[in-house]
A protein has these predicted regions:
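Conserved phosphate- and dinucleotide-binding cores of soluble alpha/beta proteins
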Residues: 9-12, 17-24, 72-152
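Conserved SAM-binding loop
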Residues: 40, 66-68
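Short helix-loop-beta connector
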Residues: 32-37
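A short helix->loop->beta-strand "cap" motif at the edges of active sites that frequently abuts
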Residues: 61-65, 128-130
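Active-site catalytic pocket residues across diverse enzymes, especially alpha/beta-hydrolases
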Residues: 54-58
């Protein structure tokens, strides 16, 4: 999404605390979700924590959102934690999509596409007013292109 505002939470991870940092990043992304929103739910090991936190907020705080998953795994987890889901075609767009990335550079340009859900992720992202990307420093590269990507 061109012209997007970038917020930067920067941490350095050791192998022992990678999951804790992913959880922190996933939860921080939930700050962009408020009551009544239509939310694109991305795919990946960090977004998993976003989905878990949104499920907690629905159960404990009464958060009222509708999610649109980008993959079967995301759909299954969202249903498991109680996030109501809809098809993108049934909504008038999305307020925010939260997704991961395969790599990003110091200017916060990014590449996605290493996973199996790329097409659906692109469609959902284009339908959203805002995109929040969650990633840890292991995904940062000096020059984009280090991650092998399939060509569509």
């Amino acid at each position: 999404l061109s012209g997007a505002k970038v917020n930067r939470w920067r941490t350095r991870a050791t192998s022992m605390d990678v999951e804790a940092l992913k959880a922190e990043a996933g939860k921080a992304a939930c700050e962009y979700v408020t009551d009544g929103m239509n939310v694109g739910l991305g795919t990946g090991s960090t977004v998993k924590y976003t989905i878990l936190e949104l499920g907690r907020r629905i159960a404990e705080e009464g958060l009222n959102i509708v999610g649109v998953p980008t993959s079967i795994a995301t759909r299954d987890l969202a249903l498991e934690v109680g996030i109501p889901l809809a098809d993108l075609d049934d909504l008038d767009g999305l307020d925010v999509v939260i997704d991961g990335t395969d790599e990003f550079d110091p200017s916060f340009q990014l590449i996605k596409g290493g996973g199996a859900a790329l097409l659906r992720e692109k469609v959902v992202a284009q339908s959203s007013k805002r995109m929040v990307v969650v990633a840890d420093d292991r995904k940062q590269v000096s020059t984009l292109g280090a991650f092998p990507l399939p060509i569509e």
